[in-house]
């Protein structure tokens, strides 16, 4: 078989092979080949090698896949086994958890039961503690009572102990003798009769003592009689028991023992009754002590009242204190004011008023003063009479001596002294303003009022305090306030006096002049009319009777009246 192969021109040009230029190809005719030749020719190419290589690569891949699959299967088997183990462990853990939960619930239930039991036990414990305390307290009280009863029994059964010891000795002797022989019934009856006689004698003695104590304390007699009756009944019972025991001649020792027991019971009953009587006597003694304390308290209260009454009736401080105070203030006031003291006639009138303390004294004094002051000029008759009456009342009140001055009136007297000092200061200002120079002017009523005020201030200083009563306190306080207001009015009066116009006469001036000494004002008026105004200050100094001249008085030589301009400026 011929096969034609097609070759490219570029590939075979160098070999000198004919080419078909039109087509660019060359046709090569191959001879037929055998199988061997084909094999040789086939070996020249790489087709077989490529196939082999491809086959080998596929084989290698298959082998690798097989190997990897085997490994994966082994790994999977291992993992499956591990997972199965884990699953088994998980199942076991789940079962364990279920068991633990069940146990936990059981434990919780047990815990709740235990807590409830604990609370119950604690409550029982606390209640038992309280009960134990109460029982201990009761036991202590009972022990105390038993000890007290034992002490009382020991104190009261001292004479009975000897008798009991004798009876015990006899009982022991009889108990030892009963083994050898039996005692005679007659002897036993004689012994029991002697014991009964002794007990009767003791009861009679006790009853006699109770009767004597009942006479002393009749309140306890009834209690003692009741106790005596109870003791007699106990004694009768003892006698009956003794007779019954005597009838039993076989058991002599037992009879003696029963006698002792009965005697002890009797002593115990007697002690209880005696303790009751003692308690009653203690209550009575307490009542007596309380009554005595009340009586003492009443006595002390009465003594305090009596002492207060005595203090109220004690004499008050003497008049020397007041007499020593008022002259000192009087002297200081004279140093400041340098005005004349009251005249001798005024002192005489004061002495007369001291002697006359009754209603007749006041009436006569009013008549005398009205007779002395009839020469006043410039005032109407009705106003003169009112002023004279008030002046007389004022002099009478200031001229009287101090009677018994109580301690609660000292404050009022101190208030008076303060008022007098204020009046002194007002009077000093009044003198500086030159009132004495204008006393001889046409205004007689105003001069009288000014002189009257000056004299009133001296009179208030020189007068002695009057007896003050408690119901006059409020009136005096009112007077003090009014006097302070009047002092301010007195300071303002000089300006009214210096005015050129003649002011009309008012009732206020009369009321202000009603509280002063009118007799002294009359004397000052007469002296001022007789002598000029320049020598008034020297005359005021000379009128002091029985007083030496002082240096303070010599310094003041003249006084100049301030001008109207200075007055208008408000300096005065």
Swiss-Prot record:
Keyword annotations: Chromosome partition, Coiled coil
Biased composition (Basic and acidic residues): 244-257, 336-352, 523-542, 552-572
Chain intervals for the UniProt region annotation (Disordered): 185-221, 244-285, 333-352, 484-572
GO biological process: maintenance of meiotic sister chromatid cohesion; meiotic sister chromatid segregation
Any one annotated GO CC term: nucleus
Biased amino acid composition, Polar residues: 192-201
Coiled-coil region list: 59-110
Pfam families (alphabetical): Shugoshin_C
Transmembrane segments: none
Entry annotated with the keyword Coiled coil: yes
InterPro entries (UniProt xref): SGO_plant, Shugoshin_C
Other comments on record: Knock-down mutants show meiotic defects, reduction in seed set and fertility, and premature separation of sister chromatids before meiosis II, but no defects in vegetative development or growth. The localization of SYN1 and ZYP1 are not affected. Sgo1 and sgo2 double mutants are almost completely sterile and show a premature separation of sister chromatids at anaphase I. Shugoshin is Japanese for guardian spirit.
Family, similarity comment: Belongs to the shugoshin family.
Biological role stated in the UniProt entry: Protects sister chromatid centromere cohesion in meiosis I but not through the protection of the cohesin SYN1. Required with SGO2 for full protection of centromeric cohesion during anaphase I. Required to prevent precocious release of pericentromeric cohesins during meiosis. Not necessary for the maintenance of the synaptonemal complex (SC). Not required for monopolar spindle orientation in meiosis I.
Protein name per Swiss-Prot or TrEMBL: SHUGOSHIN 1
Classification of source organism: Eukaryota, Viridiplantae, Streptophyta, Embryophyta, Tracheophyta
Gene label: SGO1
